[in-house]
Amino acid sequence: MGSLTIQIGRHMVRLWIIAVYVFLAAPRGEAQPIPSSGGDGLFRELGCVSCHTDLGGDMPIREQAPDLSQAGLRYRTSYLLEFLQKPGRVRRHIGRARMPDFHLSEKEALALALFLEQQKEAPGNWPQLPGELRQMLDAPAAAVSRADFDRTLASGLACLTCHALNGQGGMIGPELADVGYQLHPGWIKSYLVAPALFGVPTNVMPAQFYRLSLDGEKFEPIFPQSERAIATVAGYLSDAGAERRAALDQKLAAARRTHPQGSAGLGEQLFRSLNCAACHRHVSIKPREHAAPPLASEGLRARKPWLEHFLRNPTALRRAGYHPGDGSRMPDFRLAVDEARMLADDLMSRRTSLPGLKTNVTLLPLSVFSRDKAIHLLQEKFSCLGCHRLGNVGGVVGPDLGGVSSRLQPDYVFSIISNPRQLVPHSIMPQIPMPAESIELIARCLVMGGWSNGPATYLSPIDLPMAATLDEIDSRSRTARVNYLRHCAACHGTEGRGDGFNASFLLPAKPTAFTDRGYVSQRPDDTLFDGIHSGARVLNRSPLMPAWGTSFSGEEIRQLVQHLRAFCQCQAPPWSGDGSGQRP
């Protein structure tokens, strides 16, 4: 637990400070009133628009979820480790907002907890504190008997009107028996002094012990010895969670031993990858603008039965994240059946026109011969499986193709193969040159081929070096470095070593290591240009390397060539020039 020394008048005062809100969560299927605004209202109440920003509108979750700039001052690290792996319901007065489950591993949860442990941003100055209150805040929590606690409550406090204690009392606020293992003792005392200073409206948590003077300059006790009452309440609640606290501390110690490489730095990478700042305010980390797919045209893209099932049981469509390698995930909100149905109805009603969408596409039946021919084209000629997985073959850059038949409408499948950049302008998927009959054949194979989904687990952001370059990836600038990171690094690695996260899924094919001076220095710039423009197939290498000629201008490809040469710190061979000493 940390403290903060601040200037109040002529005095330096040490305060234990924290923001008010606790993590929010609700168990799957628990009945709650459905918002009158229907699926759109539920969509916003859950905070979906925080990541799916194309829908815009109000984001009430930003005011309901805790400001994590001060998480290290309020939450015990051992509690965070458990909660991040198994988020449970804490508060009940905020409608259907909840903390979703990101299905974090222990290694991931530890790193994120260690990052949050360090977040101790100090808020502004407090009003003047009475001397006895300063002493109480500085004093360690003392053991308090249940009898003393009950007498203090009976003196006029209304805690159990909203809160329960061991299941007895109100059902609006957090269970008081849990705060001793969840929160630092110093924060409990500071919060009880003045909930309103932590952003809690008085109609949610009214002042029980102190009120602000009319001029807002100092605290005034509501009844004699208010500071002693706070010490009694905080002491009892802190002690009540001692047994659970000890057990959680043991789990934290064991996790540290199991994952000695866990660090706050990796936790920050997770925090950014998962876009935690989209719902949780943070003083220095801002929400990502492009962390999830646009949904304004979902009714033209998805099939409703699949969508409804996916909302209740989200799986990894893009195992490395929405943008390949960013580590983002679709979290599990543990939706009830009626919630998933309402959201699916709302999303299917969103039919903003898609440029390039070919409608009323008719796909002929798929014979065994046609299926085998399509598979041959996918594996031996076209580069689709360099990014997508089908069965047990292919990369993990794009969505798994196994579930296309149940997930996507045929019109969309045909159109995305025909011209992906027209349909989804910011997609990195290139337009692969292929005859119309091949487009139709592959669309039939995917829609009618009877494929099953592949592995449905996410790759960890901790193991994705590209997750450390989110600011550059999200910028969508067109510099050579950003173009390389967005389009090439998944296979060739962020530093050009041929060790991108997708490389192991392409074996026996191996991406070129541009750090190999002996290899790259023997290739003219024209050769590298051709490989980028037309794909590795024109260089008699793996067809899994796509042709990027429709994605980049000629000048952008030339800049990429020079970016690749920077990895090996080598130039084109002298014989490839024009004799002038200048590069061609």
Residues of each region from the PLM?
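N-terminal secretory signal peptides that target proteins for export/translocation
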Residues: 1-13
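Bacterial N-terminal signal peptides
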Residues: 14-25
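Electrostatic cytochrome c docking/interface patches
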Residues: 27-44, 120-154, 241-272, 351-379, ...
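Extracytoplasmic electron-transfer domains, predominantly the class I c-type cytochrome c fold
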Residues: 32-33, 50, 56-121, 166-242, ...
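The −1 position to Zn-ligating cysteines in a subset of zinc-ribbon hairpins
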Residues: 47, 158, 275, 383, ...
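Short, cysteine/histidine-rich loop/knuckle motifs that typically chelate Zn2+
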Residues: 50, 161, 278, 386, ...
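Short Cys/His-rich local motifs and their 1-3 flanking residues in nucleic-acid-associated proteins
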Residues: 53, 164, 281, 389, ...
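Accessory recognition modules or surfaces
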Residues: 448-476, 489-515
